[in-house]
A protein has these predicted regions:
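Structural/interface elements that position substrates and couple domains in central-metabolism enzymes
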Residues: 1-120
Length: 120
């Protein structure tokens, strides 16, 4: 089955790299649409909390977070090894501005290097 059909039929496995203000709500939106999601974040404290169903973004209501984890629809990792099992990878990492108001792309570059180790 090609990727388009997997997405249409909700069979695509999604990886979200970065589970902060953008990544976690995006992962949750995919989960609510019945996709299987792997969330990757290098912050071990955050991944431990999320694995226990603890919402790390208090301003958001993620009422089904524990359910998605219990049903194994949402797997949380702090390394990139599981990336080889997904169909779609979405980067949601920071791009903070430096003193010259230029984006720091190091998070994107480092994530891409890690992802490249596990591409099919």
């Amino acid at each position: 089955m090609n990727l388009e059909k997997k997405i249409i039929n909700i069979k695509a496995k999604i990886a979200i790299v970065g589970l902060g203000y953008v990544g976690l709500p995006l992962a949750y939106a995919f989960l609510e649409k019945k996709f299987q999601v792997i969330g990757i974040d290098l912050d071990k404290d955050k991944t431990i909390k999320l694995s226990k169903g603890i919402n790390t973004l208090k301003h958001l209501k993620l009422k089904n977070l524990k359910k998605h984890i219990k049903e194994k629809k949402f797997k949380i990792e702090n390394d990139f090894k599981k990336i080889k099992d997904v169909d779609v990878i979405i980067l949601c990492v920071p791009t903070p501005l430096n003193k010259f108001r230029e984006p720091d792309l190091s998070y994107i570059i480092n994530s891409a290097k890690e992802i490249s180790k596990f591409l099919k």
